[in-house]
Amino acid sequence: MPEGTTVTRLLPNICTDKMEETRDFYKELLGFVVGFEHKGWYIQMALPDKPELQLGIMRLDHEFTPRPFQHPAQGVIISVQVEDVEATYATVKARGFELAHDLCDEEFGMRRFMVADPNGLLVNMFSFP
């Protein structure tokens, strides 16, 4: 780590024009709950039993983000390690989520599948046996 830099938190924020759909997606998929909302442009979510696992949702056109960078998010894969990927896969399918990539085994030992959020960002659900 660079001298003088001590990372104390990492909080990814999804910039979107689909605030409610994105919030509902992560609530339904992962069980995240809203911990903080600010004036309709920012939602911070976390897992109730692991509040350090957080995700932010930010209105795409809000002044917080400099105008030249106000573009829909792309090229990001959100990877989420779960205890039992088979059980998670069954639950996700039963709830009607559309799969972007079916359950598979990778040569390096990961078992995974993917769904796409309302913004087209991929969520890679995985575990290691």
What do these predicted regions represent?
Residues T16-K18:
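Conserved beta-strand-loop-alpha-helix junction that forms the acyl-donor binding cleft
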Residues M1-L11, V33-E83, Y89-A116, S127-P129:
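Vicinal oxygen chelate
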Residues T22-K27, V92, G120:
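Conserved active-site tyrosine of GNAT-family acetyltransferases
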Residues L122-M125:
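Short glycine-/small-residue motifs
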